């Protein structure tokens, strides 16, 4: 009987813990939906509404103009190249931070997050000071696609590192040791044991990095210089349209960038989920 009374006393406490600080699940879901709508969905709906304000013909003329198409080409080309490069070096940095011990490791780990905290216009100023016409290191990337690429690499690198790092920490080292005991070399162990486990994280980091890159403005505006067909990315073309009081055209370009980001993220998420499922079945 005593145990029954204790159980009755504990039951409300257990239910309280399940309900959480924001009340029952229905309340939490409602709060989440409202906040998501206010912060994300309504602004997206507003930009789509503005883009459609001039009709389909005006939308098509805005996104298919020569200047717009050139900005898309420059943006997608450089962003894709930067994403691939950051996949390689982001994985390398994450590996070093997880698997290797060296002096200053914590400092390096903290520096990785610096592009998150640094205002992007400050990042652009840093790029200009280091790689501009008066470069102290003799590298002159101002008004070049290389300069835009370096700036984008700077602001997108953390997405890959931080996506891969926690997964790498959770990988079972015993599986790697077992493969080594069977005669597998380092490259074979990495490609057959480690890489499959990292694939979902790599795809997630790549998607976030690419999406950030195609919409970046502050870090490229100074070093790139908005040279049409060479360094003018879509975000800079949007600014030009706004300065010319063509907000409908600017909204149309924005919708295209948003659509590209959404499609890329969706595809990579589906591929990553399938890769994770195959990894679970293989295990």
Positions of PLM-derived features:
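Short hydrophobic faces within alpha-helices
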Residues: 72, 97, 114, 174-182, ...
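Transmembrane alpha-helices
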Residues: 30-35, 84, 114, 118, ...
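Interhelical loop and adjacent transmembrane-helix boundary motif
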Residues: 64-66, 220-267
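Transmembrane-helix boundary motif in ABC transporter permease subunits
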Residues: 20, 57-59, 81-112, 125, ...
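Hydrophobic alpha-helical transmembrane segments of multipass integral membrane proteins
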Residues: 38, 73, 77-89, 93, ...
